[in-house]
A protein has these predicted regions:
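Short Lys/Arg-enriched alpha/beta "domain-start" segment
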Residues: 1-55, 167-170
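A short, Trp-centered hydrophobic/proline-enriched beta-strand micro-motif
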Residues: 18-26, 62-64, 158-160, 190-195
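Short, surface-exposed beta-strand/loop "edge" segments at domain boundaries and coil↔beta transitions
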Residues: 28-37, 74-75, 98-106, 201-204, ...
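Non-catalytic accessory segments adjacent to catalytic cores
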Residues: 45-168
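Short, flexible loop/turn elements at secondary-structure junctions
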Residues: 67-68, 166, 197-199, 210, ...
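Cytosolic ligand/metal-binding cores
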Residues: 87-116, 206, 211-240
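Secondary-structure boundary elements
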Residues: 142-143, 147-158, 185-187, 197-199, ...
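SIR2/sirtuin-family catalytic core signature
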Residues: 171-219
Length: 240
């Protein structure tokens, strides 16, 4: 069906009270998806791909979710409801699946539909930081830089990408979907992904690069270590 310009899939997803919730937007913005609910879950790519191979009659069926560096710790799902946009056209898919009774799953799907609510605007982000901690700290970070430059100077490496983790605490709960929306506005030309496991736990990010893409036996990767937008204030950017 044709899209209305005012429709924001992420806002609609965040308005629902069913979990898990998953959002994804392709880097150039041509493809976008939201999925809601899980009929069945998979902990690895192998499990998910095996399931898809068992249902070749549904070539457009997709499994969504998150991979992990540990192949057995993924969080992949066959969604109850999938909205997918390609260009200016969108499709809405409600999936029924059961290993024992499709009739019973149809009843559950009907109950699921009854829980859906209208779209609500996402709230703005007004956060007050109460604690900020970096790993490594400034001393450790300086040591890493010195080690990296020394290693490059000695010819052992041509390039190295340093990274650190930051733990932020706020005075009030963070609306993860609103943070995803803010990142989407700021970090252009990125892959945006968001998964809410429940009302209090979510995983999200905006990456300018794709580590890899595999289609059948073809594996494609690209040069990594790009950048995303930094704070416009030079002092804040320096601190970050």
């Amino acid at each position: 069906f044709p899209l209305k310009d005012a429709f924001d899939a992420l806002s609609w997803l965040a308005s629902q009270q069913t979990y898990p919730q998953f959002y994804w937007q392709q880097r150039n913005g041509d493809e976008e998806a939201v999925v809601l609910g899980a009929i069945t879950r998979f902990t690895s790519l192998d499990q998910a791909q095996r399931f898809l191979r068992q249902h070749p009659e549904h070539a457009d069926l997709r499994i969504w979710g998150l991979n992990a560096f540990d192949p057995s710790q993924g969080n992949l799902l066959l969604p109850r409801l999938e909205w997918r946009r390609c260009g200016g056209k969108a499709t809405l898919r409600l999936t029924l699946f059961s290993e024992s009774s499709l009739q019973h799953d149809a009843i559950q799907a009907k109950e699921f539909i009854a829980t859906l609510v209208s779209i609500k605007p996402l709230p703005g982000l007004h956060l007050t930081t109460t604690r900020e901690q970096h790993w490594p700290d400034k001393t450790g970070w300086t040591q890493l830089i010195e080690l990296a430059t020394k290693t490059i100077a000695e010819g052992e490496l041509d390039k190295v990408v340093l990274a650190r983790a930051t733990d932020l605490h706020f005075a009030s709960p963070v609306n993860a979907a609103a943070m995803m929306a803010a990142s989407r506005r700021l970090n252009l030309n990125c892959y945006h992904f968001y998964m809410a496991f429940d009302g209090e736990n979510a995983f999200l990010g905006s990456s300018p690069e794709r580590l890899w893409r595999r289609r059948d036996k073809a594996l494609r990767t690209e040069a990594l270590a790009g950048t995303v937008a930094n704070n416009p204030d030079d002092k804040q950017a320096q601190q970050l």
